[in-house]
Structures are given as structure tokens and as C-alpha cells.
A protein has these predicted regions:
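Active-site neighborhoods and metal-handling regions in enzymes and metal-associated proteins
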Residues: 1-266
Length: 266
């Protein structure tokens, strides 16, 4: 395992890439409504990212079968946990939730973040799933400080979500990030305190709880990309890229613009 600690100059570049991801998610949030297709969202994202001098990282990213991802963002609706492929056939409907995972490459460094949006009015139980998942992300971030371990992050996420009766996906994890989208160490959403890689100042990692309303079991869709819950219950996914610091982690990505937009729509 090779972990790259980032310099302050490198962290500044990563901050810019991640801020662009936040702006892209907010731009997409303006268009999330019934009748919109996920392919439309993908085109909006690509244009926005490229207009800001960056490249969509996910385009042509290979899966374990060596097949390139055919789109610019991942659009995962309802029971699809991750890696949903945008399509003109996927039309958003009132009451859906959609997780949009977005990555950018800017000045040689990557940004990565995900947000689960509501499409119109969503059932209160589903809203609760989103709320708990987002809160678990911040609990994980609170534990991402120098001297702690990767297991401290996973433990805080797992214990909080399972206390609410939700399933924590085991097979999908967070990751280190920098010049490459996926670097060491893996960052699972479960674990035991004091276990795993020790966190050091300057480590940049993406923390991303993927939480299910029902059974935690998942399966690969026929397109070899999308991964969905086997019981077809909804799943939520929130992700921030952070840098490990002494005392308190620094969040490099941002939900501020998205949440401001959501506040205007209440």
C-alpha cells in the first residue's frame, strides 16, 4: 500500500477541483425535477465542468471488466446504490431520489463528491434515510484526524446508521484521492476503533457512506456498472473529499451551494 501525503500546494489544487465539483452538483440541482432525463443531467454536467477548464474524471474510467464508463457523472436512482449510467430512458419522477456522483480533474488533481437529491416530494421515511446518511458522513469526518485510524471512520458511520435500522454496504468503500481518482487507503463504512491504517496529516481521502433502507445486500446490474439493492429498497449516498489534519479534518468539497438551493425550494 502506497499512501501519498499531500503538500499544502497540492491541497490547494485539490481544493479547487473539489470546489468545482460542489458547483457542478449545485448546477445539476437546478435541473432536478420530474420529466428530466439523466442523460440531460449528464450533458449539463459535462458542459459545466469543461467550461470551467476541467475534465470529467469518470468518463472512460474502467470497471473491473476493463470496460470504460460511458458518461460524465453517475446517476443512481432509488434502489441503485452507485454507478448508474445516465440514459435518455431514465426519466425522473415525483418521489424519486437520485444520487449524483461527480468527479473533476483540474490542474492535475481530482475532486470527488456525491449528493442524493429528492425529486419533488419524497416519502418521509426516505427523507429520513437521506438525513441519517448525510449525518453519518459528518460523523465519519469528525473521526478523520491525525492519529486516528481508518477503522474509527468506519465505526462511527456503521454504528450510527445501524442504530437507525439501516443497512451499511460492505462491498463499496471510500478511498484515497489525489493525482489519481482512487488511491490508497481504502476507507470502508464499517470497522472497529483503532483498526486499520493510521491517519496522518496531509492524507486526502474520500469518505462516502452508502446506506440502504432495507437489506444491505447488493447486486451488479446487467450493464456491469450499476449496483443496486437486491430487495429494491432505496439507498442513499453522500460523499466528501477531505484532508486529514491534526485536531480537525478539513472538508475540501462542498454541499453549501446545493443546500442553499434546496433551502430556496422549501
Amino acid at each position: 500500500m502506497q499512501i501519498f501525503l499531500k503538500t499544502e500546494d497540492e491541497i490547494n489544487l485539490m481544493r479547487k477541483a473539489n470546489q468545482l465539483v460542489g458547483l457542478t452538483l449545485a448546477e445539476l440541482g437546478k435541473h432536478i425535477k420530474p420529466g428530466v432525463t439523466t442523460l440531460q443531467l449528464d450533458r449539463i454536467a459535462e458542459e459545466f465542468i469543461r467550461d470551467h477548464g476541467a475534465v470529467p474524471t469518470f468518463k472512460n474510467f474502467p470497471n473491473p471488466f476493463g470496460e470504460p464508463f460511458p458518461a460524465n457523472i453517475c446517476t443512481s436512482i432509488n434502489d441503485v446504490v452507485v454507478h448508474g449510467i445516465p440514459s435518455e430512458d431514465d426519466v425522473l419522477r415525483e418521489g424519486d431520489i437520485i444520487s449524483i456522483d461527480c468527479g473533476t480533474l483540474l490542474d492535475g488533481f481530482n475532486g470527488d463528491s456525491c449528493y442524493t437529491f429528492c425529486v419533488g416530494e419524497v416519502h418521509p421515511e426516505v427523507k429520513q434515510l437521506l438525513s441519517v446518511t448525510k449525518q453519518s458522513l459528518y460523523l465519519g469526518i469528525e473521526n478523520a484526524v491525525a492519529g486516528n485510524h481508518v477503522g474509527d471512520i468506519g465505526f462511527s458511520i456503521q454504528s450510527y446508521c445501524e442504530s437507525h435500522g439501516y443497512g451499511v454496504v460492505r462491498e463499496l468503500v471510500g478511498h484515497g484521492i489525489g493525482k489519481a481518482m482512487h488511491e490508497d487507503p481504502p476507507v470502508p463504512n464499517l470497522g472497529r476503533r483503532g483498526n486499520g491504517v493510521m491517519l496522518k496529516d496531509g492524507m486526502c481521502i474520500a469518505i462516502e457512506p452508502m446506506i440502504t433502507m432495507g437489506n444491505r445486500k447488493i447486486g451488479l446490474l446487467p450493464d456491469k456498472w450499476g449496483i443496486a439493492t437486491v430487495d429494491h429498497q432505496p439507498a442513499a449516498h453522500f460523499e466528501h473529499t477531505i484532508v486529514v489534519r491534526k485536531g480537525k479534518a478539513e472538508i475540501l468539497s462542498s454541499f453549501q451551494e446545493v443546500e442553499h438551493l434546496e433551502g430556496q425550494n422549501i
